[in-house]
């Protein structure tokens, strides 16, 4: 284990608990290993003890790694989402400032103010008239700025500044001084970029230590007449983002930091104060940092560029007090995972590392070796002349019990971690669905803003009103310019009060001019009561989107008397944009590649599919439509879709800020593994072997060794058993047919091995892991029986041995001598195989395998 993760283990309660349990078991193994040297059964526990010790260390290592990784991934996700959502928001602001700076009313106002102020300075009647004109113009521009901020509510002030630094206008109640000294003005005047971004102290926002401002030159006929400054509500926006990423019981501290590691915004002013410089955690993948006298697990994530914009070099940052970072999380999400599904997922744990998945298999292998060793020890005690047999048998029983306890600890630790992991994936699916719907709502918020603002455009209103100098050609030019700036739209349309198309932004839609819009959204638009209202279409195909499915947002265009004279409709490029949102929300690897199997679907409020990230999902539309109709609440559950188990998270669109949303629902599918084929993945359960309980109070006792094959228990007299060995040593003989499985080298010779299931005419063995070597009456060479598992070595009273007639016509009766009556009536019989019948069956007489040639090993060829 890496040094850092070793240091973190002490803060992982679940791992500490299992480490203590394993240490306690290891001490018991040490004692048993010592005692085994005193017994006469020949059992050597050294290799078993060392194997369990090695596996225990591997388990602790993997548990620590998985626990650390789970916490790190959760923190990375939140840090990434925090900065990415903000960057998407700021990208819209970079477009806003350039478009607003080109607004005709703003340009004319900024051109006229210096002239009017010069006239006012001269005094006289002309000065008084100019003062009144300036006041009316300022009132009008303030109303226009207020209209803008009413729609784009992410700004707390809009300031127009003359090249000299004099403030020409701002929102009513704005706090900018009469003349600003902000260097942003000179920087903007000298820039030819589409926008200038500043995060620094500014006298235009005196209440903030640093303000985020977007600026652009305002020009009139090629001359710069002002600088437009949009003052962004950074603290307000960050608070909203952080609120959605945390819950009340969350110990993590979320923040944004700049490229100098200084805190820009934070959820906790005491643990992570704004302006403080934090230790660099970039690239440490969940390393420990010390800050303000406390240790934290810290994560820093760079912004992912959106449409080529990466933001102002800020990063998402998450810190969790290290003593709280790995506390057991709520596994209530398991309630949404049906028991059958959870059992299947455990058998096919695709969400675990290969190393962790191997531990249960390794534990099974060690347990099988131990069982075989104990079984052989019991056989030796029964057939030999060992002293102190009672002590040796008691020791073997304790060794067997200790093996089961150790294996149980391994199974429970893996099982509980698996349950936690499934719960974590369920929570992740719900989180990703929330992110997807957040991106969706924020995007459509901007669409509702755009159509309402553009409906106030003077050229568009003049065209509909028939004003001189305004016509369809001029309107189309305006719409085309807007569409070139805002590429999320397929087209933008202007229509009149008769719902007829007047202008469009696309050259290939000119044939639609003059056509009447019959869809209900056009009528809804004309019925809006004020400039804050907007209409939205149902999701579906439209001629304005080349007959592709789309959403259309529209707002009323009003004349001088405030009455509706038409509308502006923005036609969303839904197919492209919705899929991009869903893909961006899904988890990606460190190289930016979408994680395999992760999918997302967007439904409308009626459960119809709007968009899916994977074409295979849309091909199974019936299943998707069923899911869409049956989703009634937000949350997470496990569903089977197309032969796969998925963690299915869902979240409904409730809007963003004042935007109400359209009731859409995002559904995210994160893979949990394939659905196993029934009858293949499940092994036949063995009945309880209660016939094997020793009963020393009875006389005429007979000792047997028991074993399992093809879902049932069998027994042999202990006196004819030599030992059990691993079936891996069996050499297959291609020329030998059933029932022979091959040969095994034992001592100085080769021993033929017969498959018990083939001898008895039973189903194939599912796990042929053991070969029992036995003596046969009248034959020098031993025989090997291929079986599945070993049982106990009981002493059974003769009166519990039932005649073979109880088996009626069962195939096993050909080889069975007795049936041992079970202690528990509900349990199955244990069938005693007769060695004499085996000889007849295999080497003479009639029946399955009679007269077949005994296989011999082939010489190995040396390359």
Please describe what each predicted stretch is.
Residues 666, 673-863:
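An acidic, low-aromatic, low-complexity terminal/linker signal
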Residues 11, 15-193, 245, 375-531, ...:
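Extracytoplasmic/periplasmic sensory segments of membrane signal-transduction proteins
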Residues 224-225, 263, 501, 564-565, ...:
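Glycine-rich acetyl-CoA-binding "A-motif" of GNAT/NAT acetyltransferases
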Residues 142-232, 237, 285-299, 481-580, ...:
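Extracytoplasmic/periplasmic ligand-binding sensor regions of membrane-associated signaling proteins
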Residues 213, 225-231, 313-319, 552, ...:
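Short hydrophobic beta-strand segments that form the core of ligand-binding sensory/regulatory domains
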Residues 138-153, 183, 227-285, 322-350, ...:
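Solvent-exposed, extracytoplasmic
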Residues 1-66, 220, 274-424, 620-690:
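Extracellular/periplasmic juxtamembrane segments that couple receptor/chemosensory ectodomains to their
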Residues 102, 158-165, 253-260, 290, ...:
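Short hydrophobic alpha-helical segments used for membrane anchoring or interfacial signaling
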